Amino acid sequence: MEVQLGLGRVYPRPPSKTYRGAFQNLFQSVREVIQNPGPRHPEAASAAPPGASLQQQQQQQQQETSPRQQQQQQGEDGSPQAHRRGPTGYLVLDEEQQPSQPQSAPECHPERGCVPEPGAAVAAGKGLPQQLPAPPDEDDSAAPSTLSLLGPTFPGLSSCSADLKDILSEASTMQLLQQQQQEAVSEGSSSGRAREASGAPTSSKDNYLGGTSTISDSAKELCKAVSVSMGLGVEALEHLSPGEQLRGDCMYAPVLGVPPAVRPTPCAPLAECKGSLLDDSAGKSTEDTAEYSPFKGGYTKGLEGESLGCSGSAAAGSSGTLELPSTLSLYKSGALDEAAAYQSRDYYNFPLALAGPPPPPPPPHPHARIKLENPLDYGSAWAAAAAQCRYGELASLHGAGAAGPGSGSPSAAASSSWHTLFTAEEGQLYGPCGGGGGGGGGGGGGAGEAGAVAPYGYTRPPQGLAGQEGDFTAPDVWYPGGMVSRVPYPSPTCVKSEMGPWMDSYSGPYGDMRLETARDHVLPIDYYFPPQKTCLICGDEASGCHYGALTCGSCKVFFKRAAEGKQKYLCASRNDCTIDKFRRKNCPSCRLRKCYEAGMTLGARKLKKLGNLKLQEEGEASSTTSPTEETAQKLTVSHIEGYECQPIFLNVLEAIEPGVVCAGHDNNQPDSFAALLSSLNELGERQLVHVVKWAKALPGFRNLHVDDQMAVIQYSWMGLMVFAMGWRSFTNVNSRMLYFAPDLVFNEYRMHKSRMYSQCVRMRHLSQEFGWLQITPQEFLCMKALLLFSIIPVDGLKNQKFFDELRMNYIKELDRIIACKRKNPTSCSRRFYQLTKLLDSVQPIARELHQFTFDLLIKSHMVSVDFPEMMAEIISVQVPKILSGKVKPIYFHTQ
C-alpha cells in the first residue's frame, strides 16, 4: 500500500509524492529531507562525478524516462480504478487524478533538500533492493487517497491517526516541508516510475538511505533548523561516515491490523524477565511486526538500534516485507567497517503485506500503541536496567546452540553489532548485568570476546547468538493512546557497583546502611536520648525497682496481690501468652509466671523493711519496748524465716510448671488396645512440647551447650512424664487410678486392655509413694527439676563439667527445702534419703516403658497404633541408645 507521510503525522498526499510503508516515527520526514538521493541507474552513477551537485544528478534522472512513464502520464485523466498490487507486491492505493503538468528540474536551494521517492522493496534473501516486474494487466492510474479510503483496508489506522495528531503534531514544520516536497519530488517520482516500467536493474546502493552516504550542507542546515524547532539537541547531528551505524530513535508506532511476519522463538530469559519492559499482553507490537531477515543473522529488533541476533531458518526467497530505513541518529555512532555496517544495520522493520496470500490478520487493537522514551535517558541510572530487563539476562541469551566467538558463521558476524552509543574505550562505570560465565561465555563471566561488559551496565553480546522459532511476548510498557507510566525500578544486578567514598560503608545495593566511618566522629545515641527504663514484665515505662525487679506500677500491684493471695491462676492457652503493655491483663497466670522469672519476690520488700526497722531500733533513745512492738518484731522474724524457707528458685519452679494437658481421647467409644495406645502416644507428644518449654525456662538450663540441652530432654522425657503423672494421680484420685489426663484415666480394666498392666502397676505404686512419704508441692517441683539432670550418655556431654555443677546446685536446693521445715539434722538426712530413693525408683519404670514403646513402634503397623511424627523420631533414634546401654541414668544409691 502507499501511505502519505508528513513530518510527524499522516497528511494528504502531495500531487506526486507517495511513500510505501507504515508511519514510522517523528523523524521519518527529516530523514527523507537530509539524506541525499543517488543516481537511479548504474550508468548514471558512473557518469556523475563524486563532487557533482544534487541538481546535476537530478537532471540526469529527468532525462531517463521510459515509454511506461509516458503512458502513465497520458492515462492520468482516466477514471479511478480499484486497488491493486503494485510492482513490489504490496497493495497500492491509486493516486488522485492530477492534471498533466510540464516536468521541470527542481531547484535545490541551500535551505532545502531534494527529496526523492523511496526505493523499491528489499529482498529478504540478500538484503538488497530489487525491482520486481509488474504484471502486464496492471497500470498505475490514480485514485483518491484520503484517510477515509484507508479505513476499510486498515481498520485501526483511522483511530491511530487521531492519537498521533494529538501526540506528534508539527503542523507548521509540515507545511514547510510539504511545499518543498511538491517542488522537488515530481521529477524523481516520474523517473522512478520509468525505471520500474522498463525493469532496469537497480544499484546495490539504491536503498532508502539514498545512493550516497553523505549528507549535504544544505540538508544538514535544514536538519538543524528542524531539530531546534522541535526542541532537540543539534550537537549530535554530525556527518555520518559510510561505515557508521545509525542509532534508531525511540518513538514509533506499528500499523494495526497488519498480518505479522515470520517470528522466531524468543530466547528463554525474555519471557522470564521479572518486572521488565516485556509482557504477555494480547496486543502484539514491535516484536510481532519486525522483519525476520536471514541475511542479518536472525531476528532484528530495533528498540535501541540493537540486534539480538537470534538466528532463524527462513528461506532466502521468502521475503515480502518492506525494510524501512533507520531514523536520524541523536548520538554519533562509532565507526565500523562499511560492509559489516551495511549488513548489520538495525532498522525498524514493519511489513505491510506479504507476497502471496497473507495469513489471517490478528484482531485489531482499539488504540494505537505508542512507545514513548527519551533517548537521552540512556545516560541515566536506570538505563542499564531497562536494557537488561528488555532482553533478559544476557548470559542466558547465549544458548546451548550458540556459535562460539570464533565460529565465523554469517550469523555470528552479523549479530556482533551492539548499541554503538557506548564504545569499548570508555571505562567500566557499572558492574556487569547478570553473571555467570560458563559454557561459551556469559554476559559477565565469560571471555572478553563472548561477553564484554560495556559501560553503564550494557553487556555486549557474544558472537553468534542462537534462538528458536516461536513468538515474542509483547512488551510490558506499551501504553495505549500515549499514556506513560512510571519507569520501573532498576534490576539489582545492574545497579552501579562502584560508589563514591561516602557510599563505601553501605550494604546491599548501596552498601551497609550504617555509617561505620562516621561513628568515630559522633557521640553515642545515648548521649542525646538517655535509655528509657522499661518494665521487665510488660515493657511499659518502669517506675522503679519493686520486689527485686525493675517493673512498672501496674505489675508491682499485680504481683503483690497475686503472690499474697491464695487464688491459683490457670492459663486458658498453653502458658505462652504474650504479656505486653496492652495485653498484660489478659492472662494473670502467664503474667505471674513472668514476674517470678524476672526475680520478683515478696521477701525482697520485707528484707528492705527489716533493714529500715534495724535503723530505727539503733536510733531509738529508750531501750524499753511495748508489748505491741514486741509482737510486731516476732511477726517480722517469722516472716523472714518463712522467706528463707521459700527461696526465689522455688518461686520460679512454681511459675513455670506446665498446666493441664488433655489427650483428646473419645471416652464414648469402647476401649480397645489401639485406641488407648494411640491416645497415649498423642498425649505423649503434647506433653513433650510442654516439657521442652518447661526445661528452657529452668534456671541455668540455657547455659548448657545446645547439643547437651537437646540430649538431656530426649533422654529424660519419659521419666519426667511418669513422675508428673504419679503426682497427678496422687493429688486428683488419691493414687487409686492412673491420671494420665483429665480425659484419659486408667482404671484396672484399661490397664489390662492396654496390654501394659505390669508397667501400670509400677506407675501406680510410684503414685502411692507420694502419699506414703507425704511429698509436699515444693519437694515435688525440686525433685522433678533434678530428675531432668539424672540421665546422660556414658561418654559424657560436650560440657560435662558445667552439667555436673548445675546438677549439684539443684541437689543443694532440694536439701535446702528439706532443711527449711525440719530443725533436726538427723530428720533432714532421713528425708533426703527418702526423696532420693524415690527418684531412683523412677528410672527402672522409665526403662520398661522405653522397651514397651520401642516394641510397639516396630509392630505399630500390625496393631494399628498411631505414633505422632516427633514421638516416632525420638523413640526410633534415642530410645535404642538407652536400651543398648550407651545412655545410663545417674543413681543416688547403689542398685
Curated annotation (Swiss-Prot):
<feature type="region of interest" description="Interaction with KAT7">
    <location>
        <begin position="600"/>
        <end position="894"/>
    </location>
</feature>
<dbReference type="GO" id="GO:0005634">
    <property type="term" value="C:nucleus"/>
</dbReference>
<dbReference type="GO" id="GO:0003700">
    <property type="term" value="F:DNA-binding transcription factor activity"/>
</dbReference>
<keyword id="KW-0805">Transcription regulation</keyword>
<keyword id="KW-0863">Zinc-finger</keyword>
<dbReference type="InterPro" id="IPR001103">
    <property type="entry name" value="Andrgn_rcpt"/>
</dbReference>
<dbReference type="InterPro" id="IPR013088">
    <property type="entry name" value="Znf_NHR/GATA"/>
</dbReference>
<feature type="compositionally biased region" description="Polar residues">
    <location>
        <begin position="201"/>
        <end position="211"/>
    </location>
</feature>
<keyword id="KW-0446">Lipid-binding</keyword>
<feature type="region of interest" description="Disordered">
    <location>
        <begin position="175"/>
        <end position="211"/>
    </location>
</feature>
<feature type="modified residue" description="Phosphotyrosine; by CSK and TNK2">
    <location>
        <position position="348"/>
    </location>
</feature>
<keyword id="KW-0564">Palmitate</keyword>
<feature type="region of interest" description="Interaction with CCAR1">
    <location>
        <begin position="567"/>
        <end position="894"/>
    </location>
</feature>
<feature type="modified residue" description="Phosphotyrosine; by CSK">
    <location>
        <position position="331"/>
    </location>
</feature>
<dbReference type="GO" id="GO:0005497">
    <property type="term" value="F:androgen binding"/>
</dbReference>
<feature type="modified residue" description="Phosphotyrosine; by CSK">
    <location>
        <position position="527"/>
    </location>
</feature>
<comment type="similarity">
    <text>Belongs to the nuclear hormone receptor family. NR3 subfamily.</text>
</comment>
<feature type="cross-link" description="Glycyl lysine isopeptide (Lys-Gly) (interchain with G-Cter in SUMO)">
    <location>
        <position position="371"/>
    </location>
</feature>
<keyword id="KW-0238">DNA-binding</keyword>
<dbReference type="Pfam" id="PF00104">
    <property type="entry name" value="Hormone_recep"/>
</dbReference>
<feature type="site" description="Interaction with coactivator FXXLF and FXXFY motifs">
    <location>
        <position position="873"/>
    </location>
</feature>
<dbReference type="GO" id="GO:2001237">
    <property type="term" value="P:negative regulation of extrinsic apoptotic signaling pathway"/>
</dbReference>
<dbReference type="InterPro" id="IPR000536">
    <property type="entry name" value="Nucl_hrmn_rcpt_lig-bd"/>
</dbReference>
<dbReference type="GO" id="GO:0045944">
    <property type="term" value="P:positive regulation of transcription by RNA polymerase II"/>
</dbReference>
<dbReference type="GO" id="GO:0005496">
    <property type="term" value="F:steroid binding"/>
</dbReference>
<feature type="modified residue" description="Phosphotyrosine; by CSK">
    <location>
        <position position="292"/>
    </location>
</feature>
<dbReference type="GO" id="GO:0005654">
    <property type="term" value="C:nucleoplasm"/>
</dbReference>
<feature type="compositionally biased region" description="Low complexity">
    <location>
        <begin position="44"/>
        <end position="81"/>
    </location>
</feature>
<feature type="modified residue" description="Phosphoserine">
    <location>
        <position position="79"/>
    </location>
</feature>
<feature type="cross-link" description="Glycyl lysine isopeptide (Lys-Gly) (interchain with G-Cter in ubiquitin)">
    <location>
        <position position="823"/>
    </location>
</feature>
<feature type="region of interest" description="Disordered">
    <location>
        <begin position="33"/>
        <end position="155"/>
    </location>
</feature>
<feature type="modified residue" description="Phosphoserine; by CDK9">
    <location>
        <position position="66"/>
    </location>
</feature>
<dbReference type="GO" id="GO:0030522">
    <property type="term" value="P:intracellular receptor signaling pathway"/>
</dbReference>
<feature type="region of interest" description="Interaction with HIPK3">
    <location>
        <begin position="547"/>
        <end position="637"/>
    </location>
</feature>
<dbReference type="Pfam" id="PF02166">
    <property type="entry name" value="Androgen_recep"/>
</dbReference>
<feature type="cross-link" description="Glycyl lysine isopeptide (Lys-Gly) (interchain with G-Cter in SUMO)">
    <location>
        <position position="496"/>
    </location>
</feature>
<dbReference type="GO" id="GO:0008013">
    <property type="term" value="F:beta-catenin binding"/>
</dbReference>
<dbReference type="GO" id="GO:0000976">
    <property type="term" value="F:transcription cis-regulatory region binding"/>
</dbReference>
<feature type="modified residue" description="Phosphotyrosine; by CSK">
    <location>
        <position position="208"/>
    </location>
</feature>
<feature type="modified residue" description="Phosphotyrosine; by CSK">
    <location>
        <position position="891"/>
    </location>
</feature>
<feature type="cross-link" description="Glycyl lysine isopeptide (Lys-Gly) (interchain with G-Cter in ubiquitin)">
    <location>
        <position position="821"/>
    </location>
</feature>
<keyword id="KW-0832">Ubl conjugation</keyword>
